[in-house]
């Protein structure tokens, strides 16, 4: 509640000058005397890139967390993968943005998906890479907290590993994993620098992913 109040209080100057149309207008004219501003373009771009990034990141985070916390739990390989995932979370946004600019955009152009490589898809892909470590790390913790007694009981009844994952691990870890994806989505919404570098420089609502 305090955060909502703080945001509302900080937006009062904008609301008093431009009204609520600031949220639904796609005009952006900073010319002196005109001062016609609208945030719709930024809102749409943020929602599109964040949602698409989450769609890409969830399967990657889910599979990685199962790999680390269940299939190879306690092994050196799981430790290495877990360390690499944690390192990805510490890389600055500008590094991701530069990597996307110099590596990912040319790959998109070579694939014939976009003439310049910029767009919603490229931005969402970078965002997905950025939020996977957050979702994976929290999911690892949640899966590791599932009692071993439940899993051993399922194995004793003849369940396969896939059945144990489906009937024991997922039901017990669902709430924690969902929370991890929500936090990752919040991280995607709050990211600006890497997206600004890759989304393009067109002042218009996108009609496609490229």
Predicted regions and their residues:
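Generic hydrophobic transmembrane alpha-helix motif, especially the helices
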Residues: 86-127
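Residue-level signal for discrete positions within transmembrane alpha-helices
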Residues: 7, 42, 46, 83-90, ...
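Glycine-rich helix-loop "coupling/hinge" segments at transmembrane-helix boundaries
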Residues: 188-210
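Transmembrane alpha-helices
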Residues: 138-139, 155, 161-196
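Periplasmic/extracellular loop-to-transmembrane helix junction in inner-membrane transport proteins
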Residues: 8-53, 74-78
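A structural signal for multi-pass alpha-helical bundles of membrane permease subunits
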Residues: 2-12, 98-106, 186
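Membrane-embedded alpha-helices of multi-pass transport/permease systems
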Residues: 5-8, 58-66, 95-98, 122, ...
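Transmembrane-helix boundary motif in ABC transporter permease subunits
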Residues: 53-85, 106
């Amino acid at each position: 509640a305090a955060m909502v109040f703080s945001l509302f209080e900080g937006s009062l100057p904008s609301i008093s000058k431009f009204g609520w149309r600031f949220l639904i207008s796609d005009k952006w004219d900073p010319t002196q005397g005109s001062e016609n501003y609208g945030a719709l373009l930024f809102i749409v771009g943020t929602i599109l890139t964040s949602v698409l990034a989450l769609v890409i990141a969830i399967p990657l985070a889910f599979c990685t967390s199962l790999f680390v916390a269940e299939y190879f739990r306690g092994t050196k390989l799981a430790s290495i993968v877990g360390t690499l995932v944690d390192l990805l979370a510490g890389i600055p946004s500008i590094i991701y943005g530069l990597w996307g600019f110099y590596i990912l955009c040319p790959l998109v152009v070579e694939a014939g998906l976009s003439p310049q490589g910029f767009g919603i898809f490229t931005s969402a892909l970078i965002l997905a890479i950025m939020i996977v470590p957050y979702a994976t790390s929290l999911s690892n913790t949640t899966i590791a907290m599932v009692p071993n007694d439940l899993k051993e009981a399922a194995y004793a009844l003849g369940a396969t590993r896939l059945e144990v994952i489906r009937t024991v691990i997922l039901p017990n870890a669902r709430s924690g994993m969902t929370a991890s994806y929500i936090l990752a989505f919040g991280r995607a919404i709050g990211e600006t620098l890497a997206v600004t570098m890759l989304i393009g420089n067109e002042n218009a609502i996108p009609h496609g992913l490229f």
